[in-house]
């Protein structure tokens, strides 16, 4: 008898709507590939009962907290259910932008200069040292919650008097935030499925940066795959991404986002261990360039589940 597969979608994070779209696409793709797949929304169903409900494997199409931060992965480990994507530690590290940056920096990999702040520090008032460190980053800045995805709570700051509002917004979503130097070059993303590094994608948003609207709502965001890099640049990008992937301990499938600054240097932005799978999503786009249909992609990801 074929395995009964749970496709986890929706959930309770700020990225619920994106996850519902991802999950619906994954469900259709798995069924097209002959898989006995069923939708399960953790907002409505107790996922601790998945094994009792007869499921043998889990395809995680959840984004954000409770889906790709290691908590769900830990529960599935305890249940003894194989699942797609990275394990507990790699999922938790990848969801946490600050810890990812610290780990990559420790491994000698390039990351943008940053300052981290906690909610307690913000509410007490920034010290002169903290103000000086933020000032040294220059303008523009990018302010982001450490543990949110899909650019939720993120702001580009171009004037000093806008910083306070950007910090307040980011702290609505997390107790720890990052203030980063703005990198002005193009953004790239590189997907990994199993041992295969897929062709890179260059992202060109219509607005000032690749925010939530550009990712999921706008039809004006442009994607280039192949990315138009020289062969040596593409090789350097893929090598950097693989090092970043391995440093975090990621497995299965996912995506690493990278910026090419005006100095010609690639800088790591963040890792995504449960990337979007909507009509606007990037992993399916890279897979198509590599000759893989959407159905073949999701079946392959499921095969990698352990």
UniProtKB/Swiss-Prot annotation:
Q: What reaction does this enzyme carry out catalytically?
A: 2 D-alanine + ATP = D-alanyl-D-alanine + ADP + phosphate + H(+)
Task: Supply the alphabetized keyword list.
Answer: ATP-binding, Cell shape, Cell wall biogenesis/degradation, Cytoplasm, Ligase, Magnesium, Manganese, Metal-binding, Nucleotide-binding, Peptidoglycan synthesis
Q: Which positions does UniProt annotate for ATP binding?
A: 134-189
On cofactor binding, the record's note says: Binds 2 magnesium or manganese ions per subunit.
Gene3D superfamilies in alphabetical order: 3.40.50.20, ATP-grasp fold, A domain, ATP-grasp fold, B domain
ATP-grasp domain location: 101-303
- Where does this one sit in the cell? Cytoplasm
From the Swiss-Prot or TrEMBL record, what is one GO molecular function term?
D-alanine-D-alanine ligase activity
Pathway field of the UniProt record reads: Cell wall biogenesis; peptidoglycan biosynthesis
Q: Which InterPro entries match?
A: ATP-grasp, ATP_grasp_subdomain_1, D-Ala_lig_Van_CS, D_ala_D_ala, Dala_Dala_lig_C, Dala_Dala_lig_N, PreATP-grasp_dom_sf
- By its UniProt entry, which Pfam families does this protein fall under? Dala_Dala_lig_C, Dala_Dala_lig_N
Name where it mostly resides: cytoplasm
Give the family from UniProt: Belongs to the D-alanine--D-alanine ligase family.
List the PANTHER family hit by this protein, alphabetically.
D-ALANINE--D-ALANINE LIGASE, D-ALANINE--D-ALANINE LIGASE B
Q: How would you summarize the oligomeric state and partners of this protein?
A: Monomer.
Write down what this protein is called: D-alanine--D-alanine ligase B
Gene this protein is translated from: ddlB
